[in-house]
Amino acid sequence: MNDMERHRLDRVAEGMRPSARFTGRWLGVGLAGWLVVAALAAWDRVGQMARADDYDLAIASLQQTEESNASNQRAVEAARQLQGARPAVLLRVLEGMKRATPVGRNYLSGVAGTLFQRDSIYLRSQLESFLLDTTQDGEARYLVFEWLTEGQEALRDQMLDGFRDDPSLELRYAAIGRAIDRLDKNPELAVLRKLLDQSRHPSQIETLAKKLKESGETVDQAKVFGFLMTWDVIGPFDNHEQKHFHTVYPVERDLLDKPFDPSQKYSGKSGEVGWQSITTEEATGIVDLAESFNKEKGAIVYARTVFRCEQPQEVEVRLGCINANKLWVNGQEVFTHEVYHAGMSIDQYIGSVKMKAGDNEIVLKICQNEQTESWAQRWQFQLRISDATGKAVLAQNR
């Protein structure tokens, strides 16, 4: 036990016997004195209840923090208030991460770290229970895992073995990463297949797919991810000076309001345009519109496909796109991003959708600007369907 831990235990022990210092003082006071003691105790309980309410309000304030100066100022004050809380509040702060905004989550994790450094010795068993509670926030559980296993590699390895199928993406990533690091030079195919099935992070999926291929195994990487490979596309339509991101062209109105007609023609940027079907062969699922539309600039293309479900289900639509984009599913807007050439990555934009049984129509509007720099020539997207953990959900009509 180090000096800090001993000091904390001393503080706990001191806090458990506060009346020892005052026993003699009250011995001869009589009934009136005991009434005063009772009143003070009652006031203390009321004070604790008031502080508990204040802490809950502070946590709620942090949960709602947005990226604005006023919101951040309120968050700083709430965080300062929580940093003086009693040990048990740490668990409530961790629980609060589940319903927090991304900014609020950062504040809450910072407060939790401060409280842990101060009070962890009192709460280890409760933190262990929190870690194993899969209904809690995945990032919060990973924080607790890091705290509890710091400097204890054997314990870390032992615990990670149980997290390869965990709903916490952070814990799962750490567990799969450790398993990959410990693979033999010639790992068994069954082991690689199992790890690939358990993996959710794109980099780990790519690593395991490569190892399987090196071992002679055929891997459909696009299928593992759940990329949609075949699309009906039409364009180009005008986007001169980026003015038409919000323009509802007749094709857009028809896509959202009418059954799809592949023979329909429309007036495009430079004349009449019609639908064409394209299928990407890329393992990354990238659909290259620049190639299909002769590197047109200041232009818009619409893409649509059908995702068939056996039964209704909640899914996530995950788009990677370096251009401005809008996405609809069954005529309902899922998200919109008017951003050009700010980077592209798998799962860049994620929207939750309730798919119906049968055919579900997915529509994209992909807008290219008129920049001439070499890095601004890409006009492409990749889209996949997954569950909430990132595991591919495959269409019946794939």
Predicted regions and their residues:
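N-terminal secretory signal peptides that target proteins for export/translocation
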Residues: M1-R25
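Amphipathic alpha-helical scaffolding segments comprising HEAT/armadillo-like alpha-solenoid repeats
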Residues: M49, D53-T65, R86-M97, S120-L132, ...
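Short inter-helical turns and helix N-cap capping residues of alpha-solenoid HEAT/ARM repeat scaffolds
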Residues: A70-S71, A100-T101, Q136-D137, P167-S168, ...
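Structural detector for internal amphipathic alpha-helices that build alpha-solenoid repeat scaffolds
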Residues: Q73-A85, E95, N106-R118, S129, ...
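Accessory carbohydrate-binding/adhesion or oligomerization-edge regions at the termini
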Residues: D197-I286, K365-R398
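Beta-strand-rich interaction surfaces with strong enrichment in secreted/lumenal proteins
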Residues: A290-K295, R304-F307, I350-K354
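Aromatic-lined ligand-binding clefts that engage carbohydrates, nucleic acids, or primary amines
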Residues: C309, E314-W328, I362
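Beta-strand-rich ligand-recognition modules
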Residues: V329-W379
